[in-house]
Amino acid sequence: PRSTLFPYTTLFRSETQNYARLMQILSDAQENQLWMAITGSAGSGKTFACKQYSRDHQEVFYVSCDPDWTKREFFSVMLRKIGKEPSGLTLIQMKQKLVLQMRCLESPIIILDEADKLSDVVLNSFITLYNDIQYDCGVVMIATEFLFKRFDTGVRFNKKGFNELWSRIGRKCVP
């Protein structure tokens, strides 16, 4: 029952459950090199939980996505996250360096917060990335429900790469 003095008791309990659930999903994804998408409402605590998970665990690379990134900018950010300098490298060399580094780690995970903000071109680059590191690294895309809508629309209208990417994350978004 809700208190009239403190009407948000249910909300905080719900957020705590969301937090615990998301932490467990991230742990499973990291331990088992899972590729998945998780969606939730704005303000549901996704970002907080992901940042906390990245602080509490090793080999976690948290990235807050930007809608203006090109593929080159995305891979530059990824290399910097793993402590490598992208200067002077071609896009192919950046991808190769990221793949090699992920393969050298025991159980890495990349958390892409606000993944729904990434351009189609950047999202499509995950198809080959998946092919290269699917057994070496987990990748979790975190977003609002708009990510599911993008995948759904992309698959229904046969947009380049969406069916392949959708299959690589198990043809679902975890709500």
Question: What are these model-derived regions, one by one?
Answer:
Residues 58-60, 155-175:
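A short helix-turn-beta junction within AAA+ P-loop NTPase domains corresponding to the substrate/partner-engaging
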Residues 35-39, 61, 111:
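Short hydrophobic/aromatic beta-strand immediately N-terminal to the Walker A/P-loop
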Residues 35-42, 118, 130-160:
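Sensor-1/coupling segment of RecA-like P-loop NTPase cores
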Residues 70-77, 85-125, 131-138, 160-161, ...:
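Mid-core helix/loop region of P-loop NTP-binding domains shared across ATPases and GTPases
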Residues 30-52, 66-67:
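Walker A/P-loop nucleotide-binding motif
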Residues 57-67:
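Conserved catalytic segments around the Walker B and adjacent sensor/switch elements
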Residues 15-30:
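Pre-Walker A adenine-sensing motif
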Residues 4-11:
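Short, small-residue-biased leader/transition segments that mark boundaries at the very start
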